[in-house]
Amino acid sequence: NALKNGRVIFLCGNGGSAADCQHIAAELVGRFVTERRSLPAIALTTDTSNLTAISNDYGYEQVFSRQVEALVREGDVVIGISTSGNSKNVVRAFETAKAKGAILIGMTGEKDGEIAKQANICLKVPSAVTARIQECHIIAGHMICAYIDEVIGLE
């Protein structure tokens, strides 16, 4: 419903999870499988100037929360991807997004972390192996994109 109502999907994560953020955002802005209108999705992991300036001036823990503060509006969706479920910068982004009335979706590993506690919805992969968790995260990302293609494609 968020996309149908003109809201934006924001994604954040570190390392391989940052790559997943960029991959999922690209599938939404471009297309996944079905031809449909371009959808507003932004990976908060891509702007080198923002990433380095915020990290330098405020610390890496705020690299996503400062962007969320500036960009996210009530009703937007923030997807936080973290294999540990406790990445401090993703947790901070969730805290800021929650205060702004965003919908929070977490994608984590099996541990009960802060991201799972804060998320409205959390996909927890039942593994402690980083590679297996990341593989499941991109499959889940593709499933989300396929569902969105189906729903938005019907408009």
Regions found by a protein language model. Name each.
Residues 12, 17, 22-154:
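Glycine-rich phosphate-binding loops that contact phosphosugars or nucleotide phosphates
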